[in-house]
């Protein structure tokens, strides 16, 4: 199991619909709307949560978070709610932060997500996009889906 592609921590349930959730905040960050929504969706079925992919160039202040992500722990809490599986976006975050072409980043993201979905036996999830990241938008074409929900609450600069 590769660290970036493997869902981690919680076994997935299959009694409802499946959701592939592109989060706007790291799962391990302060508990906010994206984690609340994903947790509630997990009560209905399986949720594969993808940590956010960079929206801007990396800054020096991003170094500690980036190091945690690249090491593979991302500052994860001890427990992830039942029904949620997490895909950290290590390589994609670095590529996006360095402004690699979004097509490259999209390939990294789509490949990691396809592997994780296959491991979880998720075939046609509802995709919930919580960020307008160019890499996420570009990756959508390469992913199977039943429905796309675009849910961006905040202005992203």
For each predicted feature, which ranges?
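A conserved catalytic-core segment of Leloir-type glycosyltransferases
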Residues: 2, 13, 52-124
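N-terminal subdomain of nucleotide-sugar transferases
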Residues: 2-71
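A general structural motif
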Residues: 16, 44, 122-125, 145
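Short beta-strand/turn micro-motifs composed of small residues
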Residues: 23, 51, 129-131, 152
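Short amphipathic alpha-helical segments and helix-helix/interface helices
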Residues: 35-39, 113-117, 137-141
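An aromatic- and histidine-rich active-site surface loop
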Residues: 109-110, 126-143
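A short, histidine- and acid-enriched strand-loop-helix "catalytic/donor-clamping" loop
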Residues: 135-136, 152-157
């Amino acid at each position: 199991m590769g660290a970036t592609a493997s869902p981690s921590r919680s076994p997935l349930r299959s009694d409802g619909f499946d959701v592939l959730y592109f989060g706007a905040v790291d799962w391990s960050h302060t508990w906010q709307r994206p984690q609340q929504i994903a947790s509630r969706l997990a009560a209905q079925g399986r949720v594969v949560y993808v940590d956010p992919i960079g929206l801007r160039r990396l800054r020096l202040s991003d170094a500690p978070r980036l190091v945690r992500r690249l090491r593979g722990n991302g500052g994860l809490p001890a427990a992830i709610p039942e029904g949620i599986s997490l895909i950290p976006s290590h390589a994609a975050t670095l590529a996006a932060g360095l402004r690699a072409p979004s097509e490259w980043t999209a390939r990294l993201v789509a490949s990691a997500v396809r592997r994780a979905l296959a491991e979880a036996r998720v075939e046609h999830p509802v995709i919930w996009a919580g960020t307008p990241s160019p890499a996420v938008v570009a990756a959508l074409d390469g992913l199977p889906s039943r429905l796309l929900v675009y849910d961006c609450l905040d202005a992203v600069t």
